[in-house]
Amino acid sequence: VKETIYSVMFDRIEAGTYLVAAAVTEGNLKIKNIIPKIIQTEINTLKKIGAKIKATKDEVHIIGNKKIKNMNIKTAPYPGFPTDLQAQMMVLLCKANKQSIIKEDIFENRFMHVAELNRMGAKISTNGNKAKVSGNIRFEAAELMATDLRASVSLILAALTTKGKSVINRIYHLDRGY
């Protein structure tokens, strides 16, 4: 056995979540030590929605835009749009100029976050594997219940955009992935 050095690659869902967080809060964020081509689908999606993104060999810089464009998204295996980023993107699409549709083609029952987002003022309806996301939403602070990892992070992202205090119960789900 010989000594070796190995570096673990970044988590593309975490990176995508941070990019969505910057977009939804109209923030300015630079992520270093990343390989942008691994998350090219996520970068392209955020650009189409209106975020300003510059990628170099090992970093991504995003500036969120107040004006978010609507978009229809379909989850798919890599390199398609990741199912594990669908809830976060739904929060961003609530701020879009028009209705968007998210089609979940990977797993069943992946809209657990919708009821709590609607309690915050979102207007999202689901039918099977499709969610219709109304745009021009301003989230309101609320006491909420996280049901899983994706719901946890989506509620945090929505709460970041509110005035007032939101309380997210059962946030321990977040520990599984972030």
Name each model-derived stretch.
Residues 1-178:
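Short, structured segments at the rim of ligand-binding sites
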